[in-house]
């Protein structure tokens, strides 16, 4: 395995401002190798099928315990990486609007620092497609050592992250194929599910709503 630090150093040496810039440039230069396949399926039909897969999984999940922890936590730390950061940012903003103290460091180093300050009174939410990102796994280990409970949102059922989690919210598997970069649709559905459960179970009685 190659560490995230090594990858960032390589990206900087290649004069890219960020890994995202490097990835976009790589995709552009390899564009001729990608095949555009006509799936013969209406776009709305395709979206509907994908959404149904995740909704069917969410129907069989009970996260009432996690919702209780989120509401009563001293603070909620959100951990993620890559494209999932956009989803995590939405979750962080909405939790804050609900009056829940939310910590969302955009930098891995600050994420480590925040994890070391966690106590059993805090709660952690992790968003990861594959559940194996080393930096996030390390942060989760620190959180567990500090007595925190963790909610994982992931596509993969069995992973290093799932073994460290107290609550797991699985979503349907998506694919990246050439230009068809995954939009994190399933992750968006998952956080919307969490937010609505928060409202339904607890927040209607709060004065700020």
Question: Where do the model's predicted regions map?
Answer:
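HTH-adjacent hinge/linker in prokaryotic transcriptional regulators
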Residues: 1-64
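Short, flexible loop/turn segments with low-complexity composition
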Residues: 205-209
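Helix-turn-helix/homeodomain-like alpha-helical modules used for DNA recognition
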Residues: 40-98
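Glycine-rich phosphate-binding loops that contact phosphosugars or nucleotide phosphates
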Residues: 72-204
């Amino acid at each position: 395995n190659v560490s995230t630090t090594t990858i960032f150093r390589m990206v900087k040496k290649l004069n890219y401002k960020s890994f995202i810039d490097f990835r976009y440039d790589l995709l552009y230069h390899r564009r001729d190798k990608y095949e555009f396949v006509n799936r013969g399926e209406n776009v709305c039909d395709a979206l509907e099928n994908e959404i149904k897969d995740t909704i069917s999984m969410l129907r069989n999940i009970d996260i009432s315990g996690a919702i209780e922890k989120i509401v009563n936590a001293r603070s909620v730390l959100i951990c993620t990486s890559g494209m999932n950061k956009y989803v995590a940012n939405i979750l962080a903003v909405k939790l804050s609007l609900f009056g829940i103290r939310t910590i969302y460091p955009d930098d891995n180093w600050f994420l480590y620092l925040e994890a070391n300050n966690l106590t059993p009174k805090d709660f952690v939410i992790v968003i990861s497609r594959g559940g194996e990102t080393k930096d996030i796994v390390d942060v989760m280990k620190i959180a567990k050592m500090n007595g925190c409970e963790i909610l994982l949102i992931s596509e993969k059922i069995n992973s290093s992250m799932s073994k460290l989690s107290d609550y797991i919210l699985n979503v349907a598997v998506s694919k990246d194929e050439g230009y068809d970069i995954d939009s994190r649709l399933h992750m968006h559905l998952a956080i919307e599910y969490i937010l609505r459960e928060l409202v339904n179970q607890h927040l209607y009685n709060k004065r700020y709503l």
